[in-house]
Regions:
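Helix C-cap/helix->beta junction micro-motif
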Residues: 27, 67, 105-109
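SDR active-site strand-loop-helix element
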Residues: 9, 34, 75-76, 113-118, ...
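Active-site "gating" loop of Rossmann-like NAD(P)-dependent oxidoreductase/epimerase domains
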Residues: 78-81, 86, 119-130
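N-terminal Rossmann-fold cofactor-binding loop
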Residues: 32-42, 53-54, 76-77
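NAD(P)H-binding glycine-rich loop region in Rossmannoid oxidoreductase-like domains
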Residues: 51-94
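A generic structural motif
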Residues: 26-32
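NAD(P)-cofactor binding segment of oxidoreductase domains
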Residues: 72, 86-114
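N-terminal Rossmann NAD(P)H-binding glycine-rich loop of SDR-like oxidoreductase domains
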Residues: 3-26
Length: 130
């Protein structure tokens, strides 16, 4: 039986790193992690790591073609509320537009998509959707 291919996006973050480490210990999975920056723990597990910008549509499409994941776990985000409040365009690009594109890539490739988010609701005092 072929090993399930799992792609963990945001693998350098707190949650993503723990998920990547746990999944990479299970040899029935072929685990790949990706993040904007180089792997912070390059010798910590049995996984492949690819540096990728989730806001770059072409790079994400190439990643999906290369990995052909069965399951995608997205833990990436701009998650500091004060920063997001003052950097709307960047927050929207990472937390909305990139996630929409991830969902499209998953749909096109037949991958299951698990998206982890936050319980924070931003704003409420502006006319912008939240």
């Amino acid at each position: 039986m072929a090993r399930k291919k799992i792609l963990v996006i945001g693998a350098n973050g707190f949650t993503g790193r723990r998920i990547l480490d746990d999944l990479s210990r299970n040899l029935s999975y072929q685990t790949t992690g990706c993040s904007l920056h180089d792997d912070i723990c390059p010798h910590s597990g049995n996984y492949r790591f690819i540096r990728t910008d989730i806001c770059n549509r072409q790079a994400m499409e190439k990643l999906f073609q290369e990995v052909q994941p069965d399951v995608v776990i997205n833990t990436s985000a701009l998650s500091v509320p004060d920063y997001c409040e003052t950097h709307h365009a960047e927050a929207d690009a990472v937390n909305i537009t990139a996630v929409e594109h991830l969902a499209e890539c998953c749909e096109a490739g037949g991958s299951r998509f698990i998206h982890l988010s936050t319980d924070f609701v931003f704003g409420g005092d502006t006319d912008r959707p939240y």
